[in-house]
Structure formats: structure tokens, C-alpha cells
Amino acid sequence: MALSVETESHIYRALRTASGAAAHLVALGFTIFVAVLARPGSSLFSWHPVLMSLAFSFLMTEALLMFSPESSLLRSLSRKVRARCHWVLQLLALLCALLGLGLVILHKEQLGKAHLATRHGQAGLLAVLWAGLQCSGGVGLLYPKLLPRWPLAKLKLYHATSGLVGYLLGSTSLLLGMCSLWFTANVTGGAWYLAVLCPILTSLVIMNQVSNAYLYRKRIQP
């Protein structure tokens, strides 16, 4: 028996609500897990994984979920208010990422090790630089009068697409970090696989949200 369009819509909305709630919990849980594992303050390096997971797992995920019609924690507020909260969270994520990057550079300097010698380090640097550009681009959406020649709809589309790329870069950096000697020495077996699933799950949720809000809608328009 075929489901009606209305029933399918309700099911789809319920699935998106459930996946959004899962993304909130996973982003927070993964960050707490890394913090417990790293024990921030025990060494200079210990702050690096904590700050990077806080930036790319928790803050950036929450910033993007801010616009989810089903799972935004502030969906009762106006889009203008949510946009400003989004920008604040993105800025905090950038600051945490910059601090985390700076501390690991200092740590390697103290040990006399080469900088950006691994795929993880290179992906992390690219993700931080992209986040900086993304935050700068967000100013144009907060104050569209600064870019009068650009249609606001196109600015939103470009910003959303670029933001998705930046988020995936951050998630890639986290995934590569979980292949590092430090992480694999402390997390093994099933726990490692569960940890790897965390940024993959949140990335899928964010990809679905952005695709439905901007990319898919733009494709079906004549």
C-alpha cells in the first residue's frame, strides 16, 4: 500500500528531526570524549585536540544547525537573530581553531619537529584558513549594503555552499587526527570506530540540511 504524500512528508520530517537531535548529541558527546581523553592542562599539546574538536565538532555543528527548521535550538526566534547567533558561534569556532593551531605549532617548535608534515596538519591548516574566509564572507550577509551589486539570494547560496565545504574540511581534519599516533595509542577497538563515526554522522546531517535548503532548491528552479 502506497503512502500518501502527506504521510511521506511527516515521516521525512520526523527523520530529519531525529537526525538533527542525534547530531546535537554526537557533536557534544564527541567533544566531551576528546576532552576527557586529552585531559587539557596536562601538557601543552593536550589543548590542541580539545580546542579543535570544540571548534569543528561542537561549535561549527551548532552554528550550522542554527538554520535547521526541525532541529535548531533557537528555531522560535527570527532568522535575523539566528543569523547573528550563527555568526557568533562561527567566530568562536574560528578563535578556538586558531588557538589550537597556534598551540600545536608551539608544541612542535619546542620538540624541534617539522610543521605540517602530515595530511592531518595540512587538512587542519586548510580548514582553519577556510573558516577565516567564511567568517569574513558572513559579514556581507549580516550587512548586505556592503555588497550592493550582489543579489542577496546568490550571496546566501555561495555562503552556504562554501560553508559546507569548510565544514567537510574540518571534519576531514578530525578524521585524519583520529588516525594519528596519539589518538590510536589511546583509543582502540570498537571505541575507535565509534569515534570515527561521529564526524561522519554530523557531516551527513549538515550535508542534507544545506542541500535541501539551498542546493536542491536551486536545481529545481527554472
From Swiss-Prot:
CDD domains found in the cross-reference section: Cyt_b561_CYB561D2_like
Record-listed heme b 2 binding positions: H86, H159
Gene symbol of the encoding locus: Cyb561d2
Function noted in UniProt: Transmembrane reductase that may use ascorbate as an electron donor in the cytoplasm and transfer electrons across endoplasmic reticulum membranes to reduce monodehydro-L-ascorbate radical and iron cations Fe(3+) in the lumen of that compartment.
A Gene Ontology cellular-component term: endoplasmic reticulum
Catalyzed reaction equations: monodehydro-L-ascorbate radical(out) + L-ascorbate(in) = monodehydro-L-ascorbate radical(in) + L-ascorbate(out); Fe(3+)(out) + L-ascorbate(in) = monodehydro-L-ascorbate radical(in) + Fe(2+)(out) + H(+)
Organism (species): Rattus norvegicus (Rat)
Residue spans, topological domain Cytoplasmic: 2-17, 68-85, 144-162, 208-222
Annotated TM spans: 18-38, 47-67, 86-106, 123-143, 163-183, 187-207
Protein name: Transmembrane reductase CYB561D2
Alphabetical UniProt keywords: Cytoplasmic vesicle, Electron transport, Endoplasmic reticulum, Heme, Iron, Membrane, Metal-binding, Translocase, Transmembrane, Transmembrane helix, Transport
